[in-house]
Amino acid sequence: MSLMTKLGFRALVASCLITAGSAANAQVNVLITGVGSTQFPIATANFTNEANLPQQVTSIVRADLARSGKFTNIDAGSTPVPETASVDLGAWKAKGANAFVAGSVNREANGQYKVNFILYDTVKQQSLGGLSLTATDTTLRTAGHKIADYIYQKLLGVRGVFATRLSYVIKTGNRYQLQISDSDGQNARIALSSTEPIISPAWSPSGTKVAYVSFERKKPIVYIHDLPTGRRYMVSDQKGNNSAPAWSPDSNTLAVALSLTGNTQIYTVNANGGGLRRLTQSSSIDTEPFYSPDGRWIYFTSDRGGAPQIYRMPAQGESAGAAQRVTFTGSYNTSPRVSPDGKLLAYISRTGGGFKLYVQDLQTGAANAITNTNRDESPSFAANGQYLLYATQSGGRNVLAAVPSDGSAPPQILSVQGGSVREPSWGPFMQ
């Protein structure tokens, strides 16, 4: 959300319901609107014994690869091919596939499934290995995502993010839902349902907790939701606004924006709610903190120069070193997010009356808009740094979009039927 929107919310009387683990009726749907300029052709044969499964693993693998914009699926026919089969790699190369995947799904005596697959390089005529995964009826989708991750890393040299998760807020009528889903928007679960706004979800580095801001008590308060247990607890309920939680890389601390003394300033608080410490000491508005991946710096938005810009200070606060301005392209920049490798800064810039997602090289300072949308907000990097998830508008609706962080392909739109979806946060690699 915009800087002033996040700071200016007034809460009303709320009624919240924790519903950890309950399935979501409204799920995010992915519309693939564009692909990269260079795609890797791959054929994924049907796995043996998967025809009657609750989830067909190969369908998930193919969909993941297509959704990445990095692959094109070559028709592998309808005949299942197990990982133990002798494969004519030259024939698959002749069909246009530079890689081929074969596999099987076998039900074991305990009711679980054993999912095996092998990946071949048809150009070099060699095996690239495979995995043997254990799954249940409810985790077959995860197995498919893990296979796609393996393929992505072996063929492109970068770890895949298909087995990661998303968090976002869906608004339907007068109800808000904080949902957790697979990276493709499927398998969505409701973490929190409320008649009052929920904003700023932020994943812990471990992927087991989500911090967020709820307005259920007539003011913005920061909570942490523990996903494995469904338990949540209050982290910051200071006087005034409590907003914009951001995790430290070690998961022990949250940076937050508080209006405790008047103007909003940056503080840190222990993940258990104690140890409050003020980091900025300005007479301006300082908000939207975000840690660098090495934990040395906190990036934040401040209007100390007259208009919102991105600044950086030592993680110990301005007492350890003066804040330095980072963004110089554009006169109004907010919502800093640093890539997992620490090399890129994503932010929202007001341009031509709209708001666009920009990415800046932190070494050179070069910054470029990477979207063709014009109402962008809330950027979030994928765990491998190759994609950005953000909120925008499309066809008059509030939607999410995913775009390569280098801007090499158009955004893919993620929408929800009958509602609006905002406040995205892309989770870390699963442990």
Swiss-Prot record:
**Top-rank taxon:** Bacteria
> Where does this chain mainly localize?
periplasm
Segments crossing the lipid bilayer: none
Which segment of the chain is annotated as a signal peptide? 1-26
Provide this UniProt record's keywords sorted from A to Z. Cell cycle, Cell division, Periplasm, Signal
Any one of the GO CC terms: periplasmic space
Q: Where in the cell is it found?
A: Periplasm
Q: What does this protein do?
A: Part of the Tol-Pal system, which plays a role in outer membrane invagination during cell division and is important for maintaining outer membrane integrity.
Q: Which HAMAP family match?
A: TolB
Q: How does it assemble?
A: The Tol-Pal system is composed of five core proteins: the inner membrane proteins TolA, TolQ and TolR, the periplasmic protein TolB and the outer membrane protein Pal. They form a network linking the inner and outer membranes and the peptidoglycan layer.
Q: Which family does it belong to?
A: Belongs to the TolB family.
Put simply, this protein is called Tol-Pal system protein TolB
Q: What is the lineage of its organism?
A: Bacteria, Pseudomonadati, Pseudomonadota, Betaproteobacteria, Burkholderiales
